[in-house]
Amino acid sequence: MDVNVGLSRLQSQAGAPVGTKGSNTRLAAKQRETLQAYDYLCRVDEAKKWIEECLGTDLGPTSTFEQSLRNGVVLALLVQKFQPDKLIKIFYSNELQFRHSDNINKFLDFIHGIGLPEIFHFELTDIYEGKNLPKVIYCIHALSYFLSMQDLAPPLIKSDENLSFTDEDVSIIVRRLRQSNVILPNFKALSADFMLRASPVSSRTPSPTRFPKHARFQTLNSSDSASIYSSPYTSPTLEFSKKDASARSDILKMHRRTKSATPSLEQFNEPYKQTLPSHSIEFEDSFFQPPSQKGHMQRSFLTTFSAPTRRREALFSTTSGLSQRSPVDEKIVNAIQACGRGVLVRLRLVDMLQSLVEQSSSVVLLQAVIRGYISRNTYRIRKKAYDELVNWVTSIQSISRAYLIRAQYRKVVLQEEATKSIQTLQSIIRGGFYRRKYHSLIERLDLFTPSFVLIQSSALGFLTRHAIVNMLDNLYNYIPLFNRMQSILRANMFRNEWSNFLDSVQSFPVSFHSICKGRLIRDSINRLNGSLLGELDNFIKLQNLSRGFMIRRAFKEKLEKLKASTSSFIALQAIVRAFLLRKNLESIYDSFQKSHLSVIKAQSLYRGFITRTKIDYCNDYLLKRLPDIVFMQSAVRAILLRDDVNYTEVQLDSFIPEIVLLQSLIRGYLSRNKFSRKLQNFHKNMENPIVAKSIFRGRQEGLAYRELATAKNPPVMTVKNFVHLLDDTNFDFEEEVLLEKMRKEIVQQVRDNEEIEVHINELDVKIALLVKNKISLDDVLKHHNKYKFGKQSTEYLKINTLSMKSLNNSSRKFLELYQCFFYVLQTNEMYLANYFQALKTEGTSSVKIRHAVYLVLQIFGHGSNRREEVLLLRFISQVIKLEAALVNSSQDLLSDDCVWKLLFTGYRGDVREVKLWKTILGRIHKVLVADNHLDFEINPLTLFKSFNPEVASQTDSPKLTLSLAMQHPPTRNLYVSRLRELRKLCQSFLVALSKNIENIPYALCYTAAQLKNSLQRYFPAAHKEEIFGVIGKFVYWAYVAPVLVSPDNFKLVDGSITALQRKNLYTLSSILSEIFSIESCDSKQLGFFRPLSEFIEVSKQDTMLMLERLVDVVDPEVYFEFDAFEDLVNTKRPVIYMKRDDILGIYSSIAYVIDSIAPPDVNDPLRAVVNSLGPVSEQDNDFVQDETDVKLELNPKFCTIENPVAQERTLIVQTKRYILFIIRIQNGLNLLEILVKPVTDSDEAAWQNLLAEESEKNARNYDLFDDSIFSMSFAELKYTALSNIVEMEKLGFANRRNNYQDMVNSIALDIRNKSRRRMQRQRELDAGHQSLLNLREKRAFLDSQLKSYNEYIEQAMETLQSKKGKKKLIPFSKQYFHMRDLRKSGRVPRFGSFKYPALKLYDRGVLVSISHMPQKEKLYITISADEVGKFILEATSPTVKVSSPRCELHLDDLLSAQYNKVLTLDVLDGRLKLNTNMFLHLIFSKFYS
């Protein structure tokens, strides 16, 4: 029965009378442990309530709170509460897993980051494994004080000491503390410790606000007050006697010096209560003042120096019979305190000076290095700025000088022109005309003045706004540079000012304040002048606008006044105008009379000016019509030239014989001169005829090869001269061998990585079971040792290259059939495509389909060479066609369960074109990744909250809307600027991608082209945008997005990227994904990218044009220059490497659905192979039992015999080989002549010599496909070749009319493509090296992950070994006698042995039934273990001998049976039936407890 336990009850129990001395000691220790446990539960309750107050959630009862902290979820939530700006991923799980350590590490990083002293930190094992949970509670207490002192968190409230806990809770805590052997921290000294850290030493007067008086502070009379000088890990119970003795000795020593007895506390207090005021009894120094005594004024000076522990209070609170003495003077107390503080300050000062002296050399060196770096950096910045400023100032000066010179020149010209009288006359004449025009214009303007004013204001406003927008755009681009330059200049100015300040302080300490004030005032004036100068242009513009507005307003007022008085001034104006006109005419007439000659001269000048103007106009008109004039002139010249040519031809026609004779004489002369030069050169170089011959032969061979390469129908003899080019050199052979080894290594690396991943997953499961204490460490070590880090078995690394010579007849037969089987699957893509359709039709799970995709990629060698890449692309194309015919919409082709996407991802899942993507994404990554603080957050609500953080914290404020956020000018400006930057980045990416579209991998282009063809075929109603939208999504998400969003995975950037940088990349990716979707959409669907809708639509059109270029590719056979007959022409067979289980799995799957994937024709190649192989159980045992990799040299045997198309190809290739041998023996003008030419003995001898050379060459390199040619005579060879050509002529592949020139052209094409094959092989080698590099990097990552798991296992092993103990046997029990018998026989198992009666196991439910064995009463079952995870079950009977009484059981088999819900297990040949769950329970309880 649970009984509530309170502090009063515990204290009453502690004070109860007890019996003997020994029992008193034990009881006191037990009560002390109970009090400690109760006090610790109170501290746990305080920590729980503080966390609940911070998080606002209920954390359950106090008794389970300590264990609930082990997964770190509560601590991680606490971190998220105090750091809301950081995204923290918290791992939740009901079961404790190793990944919970991430939550704990986040909390440890948090307390380290905020500066919590390391003395309060705990280790990961303290909380995860529960080794020291009190230290975790102590850390939470310290964190609460640390944050509450900074007003970042609520204070921790002391729990009421009348809390009630059950006896069971207290006993659990006592038992746990006793087992862990952990010393409880001193929670009571924690608050004072933080007060000590926060208080300055030199404080003389107590401040009522320095230490807030919360509920956690108690008075001096409280029984649990602790010393501020005690260690955090000092237990009050352990240092009880030490404090008592030290306090007592200190008091006695102090009073022994005064030769008086020790007074009591009351005797000291009484005089001071009467004589001293209340405020004089307060503590003199808040540094020594306990926080619990701030509010108590009636304390004596002796209380200040007494240690605030229970024993010391008890010491001074008891009255004694000692004699009274006079009170101590207050000055003495102050002096003692001052001396104490002085000693402490001097000690600290000495320590500080000593540390500074010890580190002075390092500090001086560091300061010198820093000053040097700052000086060099400042010099570089100033020099760069000075160079830029010099260039700028030079250009400004040159512009200014030019402007001044032009102004002076214009001024001089105007002055010279003003002196001329002609200008005066012209001005007078023009003045009259202008005044007339002015009056008429004024009258018209009066009608349209309001409209003009409105138009002008609108235009000025538009121009002003446009100029401001342009100016802001330019400023936004230079804001980061301005900020950086300003920060550098401010820092430099600040350092200069600070150095000057220090110098001035050291030199002139008296004028320090005046210098500072003067400096500050000058700085403020300079800053004000600088800001005003920076806005000078704006002020000038504002003044101009103001003056213009005032002038227009004054002009408008004058016009209104004039309009009001128009009627009264009309008559007066007419009279005045008439008078002025008459007077003006008279003056003009007089001036004309005086300047008659000048007028005539002016008129002549005016006529000259008019004439020159007309001429200029005419010239301008002619220049505009210049192309027409040139065209007309050229036509006229052509007519004239043709007339001259016709006349010349007529003249030459009459002299043709003479011209021909002259030309022949000239040619003869030139030829004779050329021949004579060659003859002289030959005679001159007669001494070195070998060089001449080699030059001549080289020229002849060059001409012959040019003829072979360019001629449409090259001669047979030309082809014969270059037949040797078809032979492979030693270098070619070495490259082929290297390429094969590389392919083999790639396949092996892929499998190794998969093996490690599977092993890591198994270890993860085993570790989880180990943590839950379900299995022992030894079972985990079984997997650990099976694939230990850095040690792999030689059998796993050794590749079993099974050859045809090392197998027996049966195995050789099956291996050859499997080689034919996989060749058929490779070369005919319809079989595998139909196989996947059959799987999807049967509703196969996605896991099995992915496994089938993995196996199929192994058949094609993951496209590691040219041949397999062509075949794989053809297979993917066929799968796309079949799936496009079955889907309902075009978008369904992009679903994740489409087989063609799985195939392409497995084939091109890794990006190999790193250099290409560095070119395309270089600028984007430089902008987004280089700056760690760049943020492209475009949500206006978030931006508004960043400018107004108080809005987010106010709960009673109205709901924030998007329109309200956009009305905020800073938010709107930042939103627009970030959209503008994103638009620039998108434009740069699209331009770079368009420029490098030719470098995109061919596999991606071909797959996109096949996708386009399939969509156009099966969705004829789909418009162009829809089709290219599907292609764009595929290209973007399959190839572009992974590189753009995760550049660190592809080594495009150095190191890793932060969460903010990845968020910026995702923002840019959102815009690009919308652009690549091609199809138009409503602008409302763009969300916050709505202002970019016009840009996105335009970019979609450009992207569609780019995708059209991307899908414009040739067939794989043309691109890779792959011949359909290449497998039969090459002397080396294609090779793939597969495991025995994969071979049998693929074969069994294909054989199961053979009726669905192959036509019903019996002669079908696939059916023929499957029928020959038969079921898997009937195959050769040696081949089936082999678990290593098998080398399959693919054999086209069935294709050449059964398949008509393959038979035709084989016929063509064999005939070409026969012709190659024939033309090397005999010569002729054409192929038909050589074939019908009779065979002589010399031809037979030459044929035998050729066979001997070929045999030696092939024996050194590799085997040929067909060895029958070496058994033929030359006559038989010619007869076979002629028969094949006749057969090909019947099939339409050869024609006798052109002497079988088609065969010669085909051989010439093979010769020309030989060098291209070498280049292609080199490209394959480069691609293989890159693939191996990527696979090795992945292997390194997997190895590091495996190493971490292994280290955890080693740590767990050490933990369990330290706790492992040997159970004691009960004397004279059945187990005791059983173990004694085993020791006598020397057969004691390593891990134990247990013997049970069968009846007992039957009663427990372990044994279900017994058959063909003795009865349960007479049968005994023995279970023993001598190896890890391996148990021996033995049945014995004392009366009857049991046949075959032993069997072995493996723990993996038992766990698998339990996992597969197998209820019973049959052992001993079915004679015993065991309950699976109960038997496993028995095993775990006996061998793994």
Curated annotation (Swiss-Prot):
One MF annotation (Gene Ontology) recorded for this entry: calmodulin binding
Coiled coil ranges: 734-770, 1330-1364
Keyword tags: Actin-binding, Calmodulin-binding, Cell cycle, Cell division, Coiled coil, Cytoplasm, Cytoskeleton, Nucleus, Repeat
Record Pfam families: CH, IQ, RasGAP, RasGAP_C
One Gene Ontology term from the biological process aspect of the record: actomyosin contractile ring assembly actin filament bundle convergence
Protein name per UniProt: Ras GTPase-activating-like protein rng2
Domain Calponin-homology (CH), residue spans: 41-147
